[in-house]
Amino acid sequence: MEPLWGIFATPLLYYAPLYMSSAGLSSTQIGLLGSLFLALSFVFQALAGPVTNRFGRKRTTLWADLISWTLPMLVWAVAQSFAAFAVAAALNATNRIAGVSWSLLTIEDVRPGDRPRVFGILNLIVTTCGLLTPLVGLVIARQGITPTLRGLYFAGAIGMTVMFVWRNKITSETLSGVVARARHKELGVMQSLRHSLAEVAGMRRHPGLLGITTFYVLTIFLEQLSLFQILFLERSLRFSAQSLSYVPVAGVVVTGLLYALVLPRLAGLPVGRTLVLTRALGLIGAVALLLVPIGNLSVMLLVVSLLGGATFLTQTYREAALFARLPTAGAANLYSAVQTLALLCSVPAAALAGAVFAASPRGLFVLIAAVCTLLFGLAVWLARREGHQS
């Protein structure tokens, strides 16, 4: 089912900064939209666990997807002002509820040992949809970015809606979801929220959860800082939209190789050691991006592919590492709490990135390299701590 989401979302999210720029938004405004999205995401993330428990994983996923993707797709298709993009961002922020319910719907009934592979498959499916990006790039080269993406947004609204309804028909509620829904059935959303907060307050009781939570938060912060990568490649390194369309294709190749060759080899390693490897790759890529020669397509694709591979591995193993430390009871609340904390800490990231990029595009990517250094150090600490505990 995921390709019906990915074939639209992958190119649209990739080209979104260029689309907003073509609509007349400045880099500062784009950054503000990112922070607005994160601030509202924080609110919806706080409600994600209670809502998911109250209405069930399956039902919550359907309605949250329709609100967070179908509706904003239609708004983006006609947006011509900062206000319109802000409305779309507000609607899209509700995907934090869908993110929790869908993750639980997907993973709760899967054996812990198989979870990294499941996350890897899902990431691979979405990344593979990047193969369509050059086709979008060709249309952009002929028709322009604004009309091309407007049409794709309209098509995306239709395609995603079909997927959401279809997926809802063929999935079943998880066993944990049935239990949680029964427990929260008589509670209102606010009562359920208070119940959830009581469980979250006991986070310290779960060994290793605070450490992996810190790692999780920093990776989300880093992803928000990286929002301007495509603008950096276009403006500072002078790559055309057609050249940039090959970036997702390179990402597909790297992700496929990682999934086929690397994930099986990492399966027997402790999670902490895999996080060290992924963040070492991320640090090398972040530094290398600062050294890419202007207009050198081959070097750029190599470096961005390295960064994409590091992101793929990080997203795969950070989720697996987090779920490994979550108790069966209250998983929805604690998973939602970790993401809520990540969003809270990341709210200023997009605005900060926009301000730094406006002042010095290269300066932003020096900052990103510094965050990558911090993440690598944290991964090493987590691996050592994991070794001592074992």
Short names for language-model regions:
Residues 1-41, 208-248:
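Helix-loop boundary and gating motifs at the non-cytosolic
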Residues 3, 83-98, 217, 298-313:
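Hydrophobic core of transmembrane alpha-helices in multi-pass small-molecule transporters
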Residues 32-50, 249-262:
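Central cavity-lining transmembrane alpha-helices of secondary-active solute carriers
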Residues 44-57, 141, 258-271, 357:
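Helix-to-loop junctions at the C-terminal end of transmembrane segments
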Residues 59-74, 273-288:
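Structural signature of the two symmetry-related core transmembrane helices
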Residues 90-126:
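Cytoplasmic helix-loop-helix junction between adjacent transmembrane helices
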Residues 158-180, 378-383:
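C-terminal membrane-cytosol helix-exit motif in multi-pass small-molecule transporters
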Residues 173-211:
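Juxtamembrane intracellular "pre-TM" segments in multi-pass secondary transporters
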